[in-house]
Amino acid sequence: MERYKEIERSIIKRFRKEIWRKFISGINDYDMIQPGDRIAVCISGGKDSMLLAKCMQEVQRHGKMDFELEFIVMDPGYNPANRQKIINNAEIMNIPIKIFDSDIFDIVHDIEDSPCYLCARMRRGYLYRYAQQLNCNKIALGHHFDDVIETTLMSMMYMGQFQTMMPKLHSTNFEGMELIRPLYLVKEYDIKSWVRYNNLEFLQCACRFTEDTDKGTQDSKRQEMKRLISKLREVSPVIDTNIFQSAHNVNLNTVIAHTVQVN
C-alpha cells in the first residue's frame, strides 16, 4: 500500500474516534460546508493544516455533499529548506498544492510590537485574496480545540474581555468569503499522536526569524496558556472541555455588559 493511502487509512481507522468523528462533528455541528462550495484549504506546512488537508480530501471523497477543494500554500519568505519540506510532505501525502509568494516576512521584519499578530493578520488577507482568484467562496484553516480554549483564556487575561475563536465567520473585507475551522473539536494531543503514528515530520515554526526547519523556539502568550491549561488539567481532567463549553453557555443575565459586532 502506498504511504499516502496508509496515512489516509489511519485517519479513518486508527484515529476514527479521536480525529475523524470529531472532524465530521465539527463540520456538521457548525454547518461549515454547503453543496456547491469551493473551499481553499490553507496549508502552512505544520501538522494541523496538513491533517486538515487530508481530512478534507477524505470527506470530499466519501461524503454525500458535492463541493470542490483547492489546496493553497502562501510562501511569506520561507528559507529554501522550509519551502522544500512543505513540498516534500505534500508529495508524500498526495496533496496537490498551489504555492504563491508574498513579502510578509520582509514587511514585519523591523516591527517590534506584536510582529506575530501582524503577520497572522496579513497572511489572512493574502489567503482570502488568492482564494478569490481561484473562485473559492471559503477558506479552511487548521485551528483546533486547543487553539480555541487558549484564545478564550488569552482574551480574558490579556485583553480584559470574554472572546473565543469562532468555528466560522464571514470576512468583513472580502465580500462573499467565509472562514471555516473544521478541526474545531479535534485536540492537539490526538493530532500529535497521529503524526507520531505515521512517522511524519512537519514544520513547527516556519518563521524566518527562527531559521530552524524543525524546532520553533519562540515563546508567546499562547505558550503560557498551554502551560497554564496543563497545570489546571492536573487539578481537573475536564478543565479544557469546561473552558471550551463556557463560550457555548453564556447567560447574558449574569454579564454586566456586552457588545455585538455586526459583520
Say what each PLM segment does.
Residues 200-263:
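The feature marks non-catalytic terminal segments
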Residues 118, 140, 182, 186, ...:
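A short glycine-/small-residue-rich loop at the edge of a beta-strand within enzyme catalytic domains
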Residues 122-134, 168-174, 227-246:
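Short, basic, helix/turn surface patches
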Residues 75-77, 103-105, 171, 185, ...:
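Short, solvent-exposed coil/turn elements at secondary-structure transition points
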Residues 68-69, 147-228:
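Catalytic subdomain that performs nucleotidyl-dependent activation
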Residues 16, 20, 83, 124, ...:
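A structural signal for well-ordered alpha-helical scaffolds and beta->alpha junctions
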Residues 2-154, 158-161, 166, 189-197:
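ATP-dependent adenylation/nucleotidyltransferase module used to activate substrates
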